[in-house]
Amino acid sequence: TELVIGISPPFANPLKVAVAEAKQQGINVKLVEFSDWNTPNITLNHGDIDANYFQHQPFLDNAIKETQFKLKALDKGVTTHVGLYSKKYDSIDAIPENARTVIPNDPVNQGRALLLLQQAKLISLKDPNNHLSNLQDIVSNPKKLQFIEVEGPQTARAVDDADLVFSYPHYLRLAKTIDPNDALILDDNTNTLYSILFVVRDDYQQQHPEKAAQLEKFIKIYQTSDKVKQTLNSEIGEKLWFPGWK
């Protein structure tokens, strides 16, 4: 048997280390990379892969609401911080009026971006704690930031053109557009709401008990291996992630 896990490219290298360690324990895992954030759930729901690893709980909740897919989180992986980045300005204070500001277009990550812009005191939101706020919920925008909405993975490329960009360290590292450590501000989140999840179909453990047991072993390797941890530090950045499984 072979476990097939659908993943986002920025998560590939630490997972590959876990795959090599799992093989030594007789567990065969194949990683399939998806460049967008819709196909991994469609493919999982269809039964073409055993699990996916690319999304956090709010994103999964929203996907289930929109598609009625029968999916659930099996376990948590890494939690990454997010940041505001700029190649043109070296502080939040230096951001000018009408700055072209790039944020993700999906409701969940847009909400996360707006919370960070609020933390940076660039905007304020109707409900300051709502992690699903959208552009209509901005009650003050003193610098008249101009918002440009792009797909989440594309935020890393936008750093070259825009004035200010919300993005993810692991995507920036992959795109090589800017050093992920050079954020003007990072989110101060310490909870695991945004941990990346290992997601399976609702009935996976009942339908495939042997494979599910192997998958759980693989996840344990990912969570506990020193080599995986070293790779996460080099791939994401030591201060830019923390474990979601504690």
Regions found by a protein language model. Name each.
Residues 107-133, 219-246:
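Ligand-binding clefts/hinges and TM-proximal coupling segments of bilobed small-molecule sensing domains
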Residues 74-124, 229:
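A conserved helix-loop-strand patch within extracytoplasmic ligand-binding domains
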Residues 33-37, 47, 51-61, 151-152, ...:
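Beta->alpha turn/N-cap motifs
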Residues 81-92, 195-212:
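A bilobed periplasmic-binding-protein/Venus flytrap-type ligand-binding module shared by bacterial periplasmic
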Residues 5-9, 99-107, 186, 201:
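Short beta-strand->loop
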Residues 31-42, 129-157:
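Short helix-initiation/N-cap motifs at beta->coil->alpha
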Residues 62-74, 87-90, 161, 166, ...:
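Ligand-binding "clamshell"
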Residues 5-30:
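Short, polar/charged alpha-helical segment
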